[in-house]
């Protein structure tokens, strides 16, 4: 797969195009022909720069390649509502052989846990297979809903929470947060029977134990105010640890 070829079918695999070129094959040369020139504004390339490279779907198949101001070899002809901080989001119109298409992209996470969320529902990752350092009760960051359900069943409650899907498991005093169909955070409340798998620590463990287990630069400080989450403490592979008065949390941010 070459980045210079407009691979609309790769986008179709994400459910983003209809009809799919795979249903009506075209010669490679024809697939690369587009009638609209790339946007001259450098903002598209600037936004896409940290997202450059190959992205894989949750089955481990190459789904998207970003290079310069192109997505799957298709030029970005317009961009809108772009944010350049962290996390960043933007709307991008690309020119495919069958016309133009607008994609919403959200870029978030760090290192092994950098993710690209397409149209708010499809998560892409950097690696063919999921990569992670720590997990909580067998749940790792980037894990799919189906895998979580297979392990713990359906949650007692599902709510919307700041752009994420919030699953609550009352029996285990555990919450799991999803975005784009994958785990973005796992939260353990005090009294939970679930532990961090590598360290064996739970929500009731002393913060000094977390600092020692994960070789943190400082002992995590529990915020004085209830409902306030601590700053992130860095774990390997871009994972983050947070603490509050009521819970501890493993997350992408």
Q: For each of these PLM feature ranges, what is it?
A:
Residues 17-19:
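N-terminal signal peptide c-region/cleavage motif recognized by signal peptidases
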Residues 27, 33-46, 58-61, 72, ...:
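Beta-sheet ligand-binding and adhesion/scaffold domains
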Residues 38-56, 66-68, 136-146:
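N-terminal helix-cap/turn-to-beta initiation motif at the start of protein domains
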Residues 57, 143-191, 200-253:
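A cross-family detector of function-defining hotspots
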């Amino acid at each position: 797969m070459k980045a210079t070829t407009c691979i609309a079918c790769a986008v179709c695999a994400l459910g983003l195009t209809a009809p799919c070129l795979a249903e009506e094959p075209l010669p490679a040369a024809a697939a690369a022909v587009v009638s609209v020139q790339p946007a001259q504004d450098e903002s598209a390339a600037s936004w896409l720069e940290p997202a450059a490279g190959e992205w894989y779907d949750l089955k481990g198949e190459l789904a998207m390649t970003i290079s310069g101001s192109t997505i799957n070899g298709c030029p970005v002809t317009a961009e809108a509502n772009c944010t350049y901080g962290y996390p960043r989001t933007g709307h991008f119109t690309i020119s495919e052989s069958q016309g133009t298409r607008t994609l919403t992209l959200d870029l978030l996470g760090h290192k092994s846990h950098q993710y690209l969320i397409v149209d708010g529902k499809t998560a892409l990752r950097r690696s063919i297979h999921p990569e992670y350092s720590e997990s909580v009760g067998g749940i790792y960051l980037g894990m799919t809903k189906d895998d979580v359900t297979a392990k713990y069943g359906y949650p007692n409650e599902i709510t919307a929470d700041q752009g994420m899907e919030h699953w609550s498991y009352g029996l285990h005093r555990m919450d799991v947060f999803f975005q784009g169909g994958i785990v973005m955070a796992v939260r353990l409340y005090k009294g939970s029977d679930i532990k961090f798998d590598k360290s064996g620590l739970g929500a009731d463990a002393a913060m000094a134990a977390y600092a020692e287990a994960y070789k943190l630069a400082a002992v995590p400080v529990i915020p004085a105010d209830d409902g306030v989450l601590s700053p992130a403490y860095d774990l390997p592979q871009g994972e983050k640890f947070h603490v509050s008065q009521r819970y501890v949390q493993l997350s992408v941010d």
